[in-house]
Regions:
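Residue-level signal for inorganic ion chemistry
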Residues: 28, 66, 96, 123, ...
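Conserved SAM/SAH cofactor-binding pocket of Class I
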Residues: 95-195
Length: 282
């Protein structure tokens, strides 16, 4: 019997549902304490040193405070790659993996791509790795996020240019010319805070999460306006969105001058992505 795994699940009881507690137990045993996965599933126990016992108690205390396991590990997986994450950046989500996979099916292998609000760099770096002939630029307002993204890019040997930009105030210059702009900007309204889990609300950066209730599309609107000047004719916008504002986002983009605007659902059947084209006069 794996006494250590049972102990972990028991300590997490009441804070996490049984399935999540079991998953956390496996991660702790295999990824932190070094147990072989096959031994874990065979129910073999781990002999812990005093130092490992202390480390385990520290981890359990952090989990008791709902700190995400990705921050405890210092990393998260995204499309088969490992990205460093800290509380200064959002933890990459499966929905964002869907967005990148969609882009990879649709984009030219030689594209000029801008990722607005790059965070850990997971979108920009993944695109740069899968489309090595493309030129990928990534913006973020947070210097801490850019530092983490640049470290991820170096570790994964990706070619991405990182720039500190506040998209709400930035004015484009002649050099800003892109075939594709992608963004997963802040989109959670203040009113939605009460619905959020503690591990998100208490730990992930509010700068990357929230928008005012009075203007939930503020980032999408600004990026769309910038796109009018920065996108080539036939250029594309890709947005990950709040499922509550799909139709509003589509309407805003149509009013701004974009064409072929489409609203797409994620694997959970929620409105999650908006894609559109820009056609400009010669």
């Amino acid at each position: 019997m794996n006494i250590t795994a049972s102990y972990i699940r028991r300590k997490l009881q009441g804070r996490y549902d049984p399935r999540e507690a079991g998953n956390l137990s496996r991660i702790i045993c295999c990824e932190i304490l070094g147990q072989q996965t096959v031994d874990y599933y065979l129910g073999k126990d781990i002999i812990l040193s005093v130092k490992e016992e202390q480390e385990l108690e520290s981890i359990l205390a952090r989990l008791h405070n709902f700190e995400p396991i990705q921050y405890i590990l210092g990393e998260a997986r995204f499309l088969g790659r490992t990205f460093r994450v800290t509380p200064g950046v959002l933890i990459p989500r499966p929905e964002t993996e869907e967005l990148v996979e969609m882009m990879l099916k649709e984009l030219s292998p030689v594209s000029r791509v801008l990722d607005v609000g790059t965070g850990s760099g997971c979108i920009a770096i993944s695109l740069a790795k899968e489309l090595p002939e493309s030129q990928v630029t990534a913006w973020d307002v947070s210097g801490e996020a850019l530092s983490i993204a640049a470290a991820n890019s170096k570790a994964l040997q990706a070619s991405v240019r990182f720039e500190q930009r506040d998209v709400l105030t930035y004015e484009p210059c002649v050099a800003d010319c892109y075939d594709v702009i992608v963004s997963n900007p802040p989109y959670v309204t203040e009113a939605e805070k009460q619905e959020m889990e503690h591990n998100v609300l208490d730990w992930e950066p509010s700068l990357a999460l929230f928008v005012p209730d009075t203007d939930p599309l503020r980032f999408y609107r600004r990026i769309a306006v910038l796109g009018l000047e920065m996108l080539t004719s036939g250029g594309k916008l890709y947005f990950e969105i709040n499922r509550a504002f799909g139709k509003d986002t589509v309407a805003m983009l149509c009013e701004t001058g974009y064409r072929a605007v489409r609203l797409q659902k994620d694997i959970s059947h929620n409105d999650r992505f908006v894609i559109c084209l820009l056609y400009t006069s010669p």
